[in-house]
Amino acid sequence: MRLTQGAFSFLPDLTDQQINKQLAYIVSKGWSANVEYTDDPHPRNAYWELWGLPLFDVKDPAAVMYEINSCRKAKPSYYVKVNAFDNTRGVESCSMSFIVNRPANEPGFLLQRQDFEGRTMKYTLHSYATEKPEGARY
């Protein structure tokens, strides 16, 4: 099951050329970029590991691409994403986020249903990947 988080997640994986165009857009807007990675694909896992330091005031998309490739090389079977932070007053938020690397095999999720009081159903998502210890999931 393909993980769909961030922009472009329903499209085929971005090529390096397409990633460079997105990075050029991020730089042209004056946004700060950072690279994050994880092996826990749960949709509510908002706290991915930060790769290096955030790239503030970067003027060349090649610097961000270098960090992406370094992370891909060190973590080839992890999810890797780029976040772009807009520090404009009133926005001050992540304005763009997209995945740039995926594991070769994405095992998907188990939907667990639980009967609860008053005929209420509770649902829980469980990633098959998390059945293995951290660092050995893919």
UniProtKB/Swiss-Prot annotation:
Compartments, record wording: Plastid, Chloroplast
GO terms assigned for molecular function: ribulose-bisphosphate carboxylase activity
CDD domains per UniProt: RuBisCO_small
The entry's keywords: Calvin cycle, Carbon dioxide fixation, Chloroplast, Photorespiration, Photosynthesis, Plastid
Gene Ontology annotations for the cellular component aspect, listed alphabetically: chloroplast
A biological process from GO: reductive pentose-phosphate cycle
A Pfam family of this chain: RuBisCO_small
Domain of life: Eukaryota
Miscellaneous section: In this alga, in contrast to plants, the small subunit is encoded in the chloroplast. The basic functional RuBisCO is composed of a large chain homodimer in a 'head-to-tail' conformation. In form I RuBisCO this homodimer is arranged in a barrel-like tetramer with the small subunits forming a tetrameric 'cap' on each end of the 'barrel'.
Family: Belongs to the RuBisCO small chain family.
Record's function text: RuBisCO catalyzes two reactions: the carboxylation of D-ribulose 1,5-bisphosphate, the primary event in carbon dioxide fixation, as well as the oxidative fragmentation of the pentose substrate in the photorespiration process. Both reactions occur simultaneously and in competition at the same active site. Although the small subunit is not catalytic it is essential for maximal activity.
Subunit structure: Heterohexadecamer of 8 large and 8 small subunits.
Protein name: Ribulose bisphosphate carboxylase small subunit
Organism whose genome encodes this protein: Porphyra purpurea (Red seaweed)
Lineage: Eukaryota, Rhodophyta, Bangiophyceae, Bangiales, Bangiaceae
Gene name linked to the record: rbcS
